[in-house]
From Swiss-Prot:
Gene name in the database record: TRMT10A
Residues in coiled coil: 52-80
GO biological process: one example: tRNA N1-guanine methylation
Organism whose genome encodes this protein: Bos taurus (Bovine)
Amino acid composition bias (Basic and acidic residues), ranges on this chain: 308-328
Annotated stretches, region: Disordered: 1-91, 296-338
Residue stretches of biased makeup (Polar residues): 329-338
Domain of life: Eukaryota
Protein name: tRNA methyltransferase 10 homolog A
InterPro entries listed in its UniProt record: MT_TRM10-typ (IPR028564), MT_TRM10-typ_sf (IPR038459), TRM10/TRM10A (IPR016653), tRNA_m1G_MeTrfase_euk (IPR007356), tRNA_MeTrfase_TRMD/TRM10 (IPR016009)
Reaction catalyzed: guanosine(9) in tRNA + S-adenosyl-L-methionine = N(1)-methylguanosine(9) in tRNA + S-adenosyl-L-homocysteine + H(+)
Bias kind Basic residues: ranges: 61-73
Length: 338
């Protein structure tokens, strides 16, 4: 290759190299190329794993639903012919005794909650509705001040709520259609302890999921409006590791359970979730007294052993002093000339 051709050849190589570099740069800048190599966080990985597991178990869930339908069909076919007219169902329904007690979920705190908490409240209300429908002593269920974010969320995610039965859903505040002297607001901040339920009264549960951001709000509202207030006798029967504030559905279900059993302790321990770490107060007191007694006995043993050691040390010291005295006397006697 002649010296005249070298500059042209090197220039051509440089042009091709720049072209390749620009193509690589464009490829790297394509949308999605950087996302492909982004690391996945642990939370995203868990979501992906759950989604994958959900998809893998789709057929299994379908099969279980199918088996459940077949099982129910067989149960219906095995029923005696005398019950073919539905008399058995009527007998079961006759066992249900509706309570005149009015139980109200006050939804007037809509503006104090973010959407995530609104959705939680919606689920708790769904649970209350379902439990009341299957209860042996269902209450007169009221949902008041219904509107705002809650109604919007129910319209979007639970359109069937408009067909709910045995429930009074009202946009008005409960004070507009229930007399003040009939109302009792249930709040954990109240100094009044509820001993038993008066089924002629209307009990109000604050529909608020606030994670303790608005502590004492329901108590203040009841006091400002001159409404009687009380708290469930939780502290009389239950010792818990966590705070005494319960979810809306837990309060609702405890009242349903009490109406059936007339036993507060049984109602609490039937409904309270295990994560609350609830134990009966008498067991908690026995445990505390046992721990104190054990500590006292253990401390007594330690002090006794210390006294014994001290006495032993004193006796040893006296013995050494006596021995030294005898030795000194003996040496003195031996040193005297005979």
């Amino acid at each position: 290759m002649s010296s005249e051709m070298l500059p042209a050849f090197s220039e051509t190589c440089n042009v091709e190299r720049q072209k390749n570099l620009s193509e690589d740069g464009e490829q790297n800048q394509k949308p999605g190329s950087s996302e492909r190599f982004q690391p996945i966080s642990k939370r995203q990985m868990k979501k992906l794993m759950k989604q994958k597991q959900w998809e893998e178990q789709r057929e299994l869930r379908k099969q279980k639903r199918k088996e459940k339908r077949k099982r129910k069909q067989l149960e219906r076919q095995c029923q005696p012919e005398s019950n073919s007219d539905g008399s058995d169902r009527k007998r079961i329904r006759r066992d249900v005794v509706h309570s005149p007690l009015r139980l109200i979920i006050d939804c007037s705190f809509d503006s104090l909650m973010v959407l995530k908490d609104i959705k939680k409240l919606h689920k708790q209300i769904q649970r209350c509705y379902a439990e009341n429908r299957r209860a042996l002593h269902p209450v007169q269920f009221y949902l008041t001040s219904h509107g705002g974010q809650l109604k919007k969320n129910m319209d979007e995610n639970d359109k069937g709520w408009v067909n709910w039965k045995d429930i009074h859903i009202k946009p008005e505040h409960y004070s507009e259609f229930i007399q003040k002297e009939d109302l009792i607001y249930l709040t954990s901040d109240s100094p009044n302890i509820l001993k038993e339920l008066d089924e002629s009264k209307a009990y109000v549960i604050g529909g608020l999921v606030d994670h303790n951001h608005h502590k004492g709000l329901t108590y203040k509202q009841a006091s400002d409006h001159g409404i009687d207030h009380a708290q469930l006798p939780l502290g009389n029967f239950v010792k818990m590791n966590s705070r005494k504030v319960l979810a809306v559905n837990h309060v609702f279900e405890i009242i349903l359970e009490y109406l059936e059993t007339r036993d507060w302790q049984e109602a609490f321990f039937t409904i309270l979730p295990q994560r609350k770490g609830a134990v009966p107060t008498d067991q908690a007191c026995e445990s505390c007294s046992h721990d104190k007694k054990f500590a006292r006995v253990e401390g007594g043993l330690n002090s006794d052993s210390s006294e014994e050691e001290n006495r032993h040390e004193l006796d040893s010291t006296h013995e050494e002093e006596k021995q030294d005295k005898e030795n000194s006397t003996e040496s003195t006697v031996n040193s005297v000339p005979h």
